[in-house]
Swiss-Prot record:
Origin superkingdom: Archaea
CDD domains referenced in this protein's UniProt entry, alphabetically: RraA_family (cd16841)
Lineage, broadest ranks: Archaea, Methanobacteriati, Methanobacteriota, Methanomada group, Methanococci
GO molecular function: 4-hydroxy-4-methyl-2-oxoglutarate aldolase activity; oxaloacetate decarboxylase activity
Gene3D superfamilies, per database record: Ribonuclease E inhibitor RraA/RraA-like
InterPro entries cross-referenced by the UniProt entry: RraA/RraA-like (IPR005493), RraA/RraA-like_sf (IPR036704)
Originating organism: Methanocaldococcus jannaschii (strain ATCC 43067 / DSM 2661 / JAL-1 / JCM 10045 / NBRC 100440) (Methanococcus jannaschii)
The protein's name: Uncharacterized protein MJ0644
A matching Pfam family: RraA-like
Length: 208
């Protein structure tokens, strides 16, 4: 059964590139509300989650995680009252992650070195940014369930991000969400055609 699920999920992952994050959100994927891309024109990226739980001043654990996050999407829960006053990710981490083949990073907290991240065009999604840095404490937990923006993310969950934000999909739900997204996209295509023919969106949607 696990082998069959792996095959099904693998095929579904190849189809993800055909949808936007809003498509997938409408189809049932869970949004990480408040998480935004550092790159304003961020293209669609996706991958399996490798999760990290750290204190607001510990960037060491994230640096450690990069070493075994190839083809993964790092998702970090940042805990503590200082999570919006201290950055746990920056330009050097982004450079290292890009070279190591990390798909992207989600930080439920702050990042810095925004200009460096943009120059690298490395997919970083975060709540905010600030100049203050934490410390290389390396006291966090890796590959545990984390609470990111109120959503429980587990290792292996599918993370999808673009210029609109980030959503999370459980592997077992991926085929259903893909099918829902196909139907949604087809409905939108038909609506778009009617608008181009001169109809008002209000009338197309039967709004009084």
């Amino acid at each position: 059964m696990k082998v069959l699920l792996k095959i099904i999920v693998g095929r579904a992952m190849n189809i993800l590139k055909n949808f936007s994050v809003p498509n997938l959100c409408d189809a049932g994927a869970k949004p990480l509300n408040g998480i935004k891309p550092i790159l304003e024109n961020q293209k669609l990226v996706f991958g399996e989650a490798i999760t990290v739980k750290i204190s607001y001043n510990d960037w060491g654990t994230l640096i450690k995680t990069i070493s075994f996050a190839k083809n993964k999407f790092i998702v970090a829960e940042v805990v503590g009252e200082g999570k919006y006053e201290t950055a746990v990710w920056g330009g050097l981490a982004s450079l290292n992650a890009k070279i190591k083949g990390v798909r992207g990073v989600v930080i439920d907290g702050c990042v810095r070195d925004v200009e460096d991240i943009k120059a690298l065009k490395f997919p970083v999604f975060a709540k905010n940014f600030c100049p203050n840095a934490g410390k290389p404490l390396n006291l966090g937990e890796i590959n545990v369930a984390v609470n990111c923006c109120g959503v429980i993310v587990e290792p292996g969950d599918i993370i999808v991000g673009d210029c609109n934000g980030v959503v999370v999909i459980k592997k077992e739900s991926l085929p259903e969400i893909i099918e829902n997204a196909k139907n949604i996209k087809e409905k939108e295509r038909k609506i778009r055609e009617r608008i181009l023919r001169g109809q008002d969106l209000r009338d197309v949607l039967n709004l009084e």
